[in-house]
Each structure stands twice: as structure tokens, then as C-alpha cells.
């Protein structure tokens, strides 16, 4: 999964969710699908965290210049 892209993994995760919600899988197949989904969810979460750390916000100063600051959200602790 290392060379996999975020979008590909997200699509696979969505497919797993559809299969599980469909209710037609056996218990064993449901467990396998769940395990696959957990791997894709973890991969996507990691990629999103990496992307968030790369994003910087430009803050305009009073003199018209800009400074970079890390991107933060309201729910950061």
C-alpha cells in the first residue's frame, strides 16, 4: 500500500463500506473486508495528516508583506 495514492485507497475504502452495508457477505468475508477497510482508513488518515502539516497560511502584515504560519484548525489542541 506504500505506493498507493490517497484517492485510490479512498475508493477502495468506499467499496468495502458498500459491501459491508449490503449485508450479503458471510461472516468470514465481512471480517476480511473490515480488516481491509481499517487498513485503507488508516492509510487515508495518515495521508491527510501529512497534507495538513504541509499546508501553510500566508498572513498579511500591516506593512503589506506576508509571513508564513502553520495551518491550524479550531479543534487543534
Swiss-Prot record:
One of its GO terms (cellular component) is exodeoxyribonuclease VII complex. It holds the Pfam family Exonuc_VII_S. Its EC number is 3.1.11.6. It is found in: Cytoplasm. It is an enzyme of class 3 (hydrolase). It catalyses: Exonucleolytic cleavage in either 5'- to 3'- or 3'- to 5'-direction to yield nucleoside 5'-phosphates. The keyword Nuclease applies. SUPFAM superfamilies: XseB-like (SSF116842). Keywords: Cytoplasm, Exonuclease, Hydrolase, Nuclease. Transmembrane segments: none annotated. Heterooligomer composed of large and small subunits. NCBIfam families: PRK00977.1-4, PRK14066.1, xseB. HAMAP family: Exonuc_7_S. Bidirectionally degrades single-stranded DNA into large acid-insoluble oligonucleotides, which are then degraded further into small acid-soluble oligonucleotides. This is Exodeoxyribonuclease 7 small subunit. It comes from Trichlorobacter lovleyi (strain ATCC BAA-1151 / DSM 17278 / SZ) (Geobacter lovleyi).
Amino acid at each position: 500500500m506504500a505506493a498507493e495514492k490517497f484517492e485510490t485507497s479512498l475508493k477502495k475504502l468506499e467499496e468495502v463500506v458498500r459491501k459491508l452495508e449490503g449485508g450479503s457477505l458471510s461472516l468470514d468475508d465481512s471480517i476480511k473486508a473490515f480488516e481491509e477497510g481499517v487498513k485503507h482508513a488508516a492509510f487515508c488518515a495518515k495521508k491527510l495528516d501529512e497534507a495538513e502539516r504541509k499546508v501553510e497560511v500566508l498572513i498579511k502584515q500591516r506593512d503589506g508583506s506576508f509571513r508564513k504560519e502553520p495551518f491550524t484548525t479550531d479543534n487543534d489542541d
